[in-house]
Structures are given as structure tokens and as C-alpha cells.
């Protein structure tokens, strides 16, 4: 017997929530039970998150991240004012289109804090991709790394000087 990862249908927050839930081998009922949802359709609230009919609150998002053992940044709705949102968007895009490449001409980009964070993160990501391609790490380890990317180190990277950086940092506290 083997397990094949389900396909990511799109990059919406709801689809990412569903994708990770399935990856963790959980049902909607498992999640409803964990959160203590009751009533006739206990998984209705969570289904509305996965179907993009409702957005989880910041507190609920932190709780979901805890249940799924992922960074909140992997499952939050992206606004792209934050460099972390850009990085995670590309990582999720790779789940939809495996092995796509990002090429940078590092000498031609504007030297801003935003771009530096993206450049450093992509460089680290490229190193992990190489490890996966050389079979130094398993695909599962690579995906876990992406789900938890910068979860513990984000506080050190983000200075909190700009509004978008503060938004990212508040999820990590």
C-alpha cells in the first residue's frame, strides 16, 4: 500500500486548508471534533472555510495551524504586501505545478528590504530543492519544510519597520 498526495486544485486559502487536512489524513469530522463543533452538521463551519465561503479569524487560524502543525503563513489569506506572502505563494504554486523554476538575475533587482527577504528565502528554498533532487531528503520532508518555512526564524528576519512586516510578525508571536 502507498499514499499519493492529493492534487492541489487552486491556490485559494480554502483549498490549501483542505489540502493540508487531507495530507494530515484528517476528515472534516476529525477537525470539527477537535474544535468541539456541535449540532446537526458539526463540520459545516470548517467546510465553509475550505469552500472559501468564510474566512477563519486570526485566532482560529492560529488554532488550525497548531492542529495541522504548520506555520500560519502557510494557510493564511495572502495580500502580497508581505514578502512572506510572495514566498509562500510560490511554494504553493510548486505544489500545483511541480518542479517549476524561478530564475533571478540578482544584479538587476532593486535593493530593498522587501526584495532582500525574498531573495534570501528563495536562495534557502533552492538549497532545499537541490537536496530533494539529490535524494538527500524525502519529498515528505521537503513538503514539511515548506509548510513550516520560517516558522521559528521569522522573528529574526523581520525587523518590524514596515506595516506589512508587522502584519507578518503578529502571526508568529
Q: What positions do the PLM features span?
A:
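Mature, Sec-exported extracytoplasmic domains of Gram-positive
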Residues: 40, 50, 121-123, 132, ...
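Short, Lys/Arg-enriched N-terminal segment that forms or immediately precedes the first helix
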Residues: 1-5
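Short, charged, amphipathic alpha-helical segments
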Residues: 139-147
Amino acid at each position: 500500500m502507498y499514499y499519493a498526495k492529493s492534487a492541489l486544485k487552486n491556490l485559494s486559502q480554502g483549498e490549501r486548508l483542505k489540502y493540508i487536512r487531507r495530507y494530515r489524513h484528517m476528515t472534516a469530522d476529525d477537525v470539527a471534533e477537535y474544535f468541539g463543533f456541535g449540532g446537526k452538521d458539526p463540520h459545516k463551519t470548517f467546510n465553509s472555510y475550505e469552500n472559501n465561503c468564510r474566512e477563519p479569524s486570526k485566532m482560529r487560524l492560529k488554532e488550525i495551524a497548531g492542529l495541522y502543525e504548520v506555520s500560519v503563513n502557510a494557510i493564511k489569506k495572502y495580500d502580497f504586501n508581505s514578502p512572506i506572502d510572495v514566498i509562500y505563494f510560490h511554494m504553493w504554486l510548486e505544489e500545483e505545478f511541480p518542479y517549476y523554476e524561478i530564475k533571478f538575475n540578482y544584479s538587476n533587482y532593486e535593493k530593498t528590504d522587501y526584495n532582500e527577504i525574498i531573495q534570501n528565502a528563495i536562495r534557502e528554498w533552492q538549497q532545499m530543492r537541490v537536496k530533494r533532487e539529490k535524494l538527500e531528503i524525502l519529498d515528505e520532508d521537503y513538503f514539511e519544510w515548506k509548510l513550516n518555512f520560517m516558522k521559528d526564524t521569522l522573528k529574526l528576519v523581520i525587523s518590524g519597520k514596515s506595516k506589512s512586516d508587522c502584519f507578518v510578525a503578529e502571526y508568529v508571536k
